[in-house]
Design a protein with these regions (language model features):
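Extended soluble regions of mature proteins
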Residues: 22-273
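Bacterial Sec-dependent N-terminal signal peptides
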Residues: 1-31
Length: 273
């Protein structure tokens, strides 16, 4: 299975196409049946990002959802958006792209003040790490803007190597937002980094949920590691996918029609430090 995955991956890398495509499709996360919380607010964000900084006009989009419960917050790929966001090669099961944040799940425990992150597609098993909450140190500005009918206020912060401009609304008094961006006196509805390589914008806010949405713990088996190690693995994987295949499969993939000893793919992570 892994060998087939990497041969498919390499064929994508070597192929010449006019459109961007996912180079590392992985299966979606699976979740336990027993919930850890019930969502009282659901926010869907559209994330636009540039996978290759050398081709800034080629942007990709993903829909991700933020589920807020009394104790837990979960940020993940939007299950309802699968029809638009997934790739499903002929003869295969459901796949999601590794690029961006689709292959990651973030669960924040507001009581303990820590976040657990799960990442698929970079090791034989899923990897996970836990970190103490370290929200951006926001500088709140006086400027306001109307977004989705809400009056939003501007804030700026440097965080994990990028400088962000966020717009939050105190009309929804929850100190949350997309990905790891939180800590403002209101929900973040829009946020963009200074290079416009990553942009999040809320496209749906549901507070009176017609159907109960549970926040479920991740079921997949995982290896516990650190954020630094995960970022190093991701960087190395993109730098040399042949060696990455050897690590995961136990032997180096053979590429028909190519004598290349190293094959690299573009890598523009949201975390730069």
């Amino acid at each position: 299975m892994i060998r087939i995955f990497f041969l498919s991956l390499l064929s994508c890398v070597l192929a010449t196409t006019s459109q961007a495509q996912s180079l590392f499709p992985v299966s979606p996360h699976s979740f336990h049946d027993e919930p850890i919380d019930t969502a009282v607010l659901r926010v869907v964000y559209r994330m636009r990002f540039i996978p290759d900084i050398h081709q800034p006009k080629q942007k990709e989009e993903q829909e991700l959802e933020l589920l807020l419960g009394k104790r837990y917050e979960q940020f993940r790929f939007n299950a309802a958006g699968y029809g638009k966001e997934i790739s499903k090669p002929s003869g295969s099961g459901l796949n999601i792209p590794e690029e961006g944040l689709a292959a990651s799940v973030f669960i924040f425990d507001k009581h303990l003040g820590h976040r657990q992150t799960y990442v698929k597609g970079i090791a034989p098993s899923m990897v996970s790490y836990t970190e103490k909450e370290a929200s951006p140190q926001w500088d709140i500005k006086a400027e306001t803007e109307l977004i989705m009918g809400y009056t939003c206020q501007k804030a700026e912060a440097k965080y994990l190597g990028r400088t962000y401009t966020a717009w939050f609304t105190s009309d929804i008094p929850v100190s949350s937002g997309p990905w790891k961006l939180r800590g403002l006196p209101g929900l973040i509805l829009r946020v963009t980094d200074s290079n416009r390589e990553y942009q999040f914008e809320a496209i749906l806010i549901e507070s009176n949920l017609k159907n109960t949405i549970f926040i479920m713990p991740v079921k997949d088996r995982y290896t516990l590691t650190s954020r630094k190690k995960v970022n190093e693995l991701l960087k190395h994987m993109h730098k040399d996918i042949l060696q990455a295949g050897e690590v995961i499969n136990g032997r180096r993939p053979q590429v028909i029609g190519s004598n290349a000893s190293v094959i690299s793919v573009p890598y523009n992570p949201i975390e730069l430090e």
